[in-house]
A protein has these predicted regions:
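A short, internal acetyl-CoA/4′-phosphopantetheine-binding micro-motif in the GNAT/acyltransferase core
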Residues: 97-108, 137
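A short acidic/small-residue loop/turn micro-motif
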Residues: 87-89
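Short amphipathic alpha-helix that is part of the acyltransferase structural core
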Residues: 2-59
């Protein structure tokens, strides 16, 4: 597969959190929601995590307990992937959590690395020492499993997400 990050002009931009889902500046946010739902269906094999745009927008607009922000990777006007970052508003917070989502047809082409670089940059700028992510996988995935360092669950060792995260230094 061609590496999009090397062959196409792609840009990474901060996702604007619009006032409403039908606002003029909502397009990238809405595409992020679409991609999040496509990733859930592809990776988990079901849509029980499906979220409607208004539901996700409410979550992003509520910054009471968590600062939430995101970045999208675009080719021209096409949103190819996004990353959602969550940082606790507790004064002693040291962790940034993230959900990295690349539209399934564009996976494995260098976009994941571009988005992860934004997570790492944001963590450095905020002085956060720990980066944590969550993965989705099919519950019936065959093969060996790895126990994450957090102790939460286990992930399929042969899963593409697991391989990417291990190659990126996650344990």
């Amino acid at each position: 597969m061609t590496d999009l990050a090397e062959t196409d002009v792609v840009t990474v931009q901060r996702i604007v959190v619009p006032e409403t889902a039908d606002a003029a500046d909502a397009r990238v946010f809405l595409e992020m929601v679409r991609i999040a739902n496509a990733v859930c269906l592809e990776d988990a094999g079901h849509d029980y995590l499906h979220e409607e745009p208004d539901e996700m927008l409410g979550f992003w607009q509520d910054q009471t307990d968590w600062t939430q922000l995101g970045f999208a990777v675009l080719r021209a006007d096409e949103v190819l992937g996004a990353v959602k970052l969550m940082i606790s508003n507790e004064s002693d917070a040291s962790t940034i959590e993230f959900d990295l989502m690349v539209d399934p047809p564009h996976r494995g082409r260098g976009l994941e690395e571009l988005l992860l670089a934004e997570v790492e940059r944001e963590a450095r700028e905020r002085g956060l020492a720990t980066i944590q992510t969550w993965t989705l996988h099919r519950p019936d995935a065959a093969g060996p499993r790895l126990q994450p360092s957090t102790g939460w669950g286990a992930v399929p060792a042969d899963d593409a997400q697991t391989k990417f995260q291990l190659a990126s230094g996650f344990t």
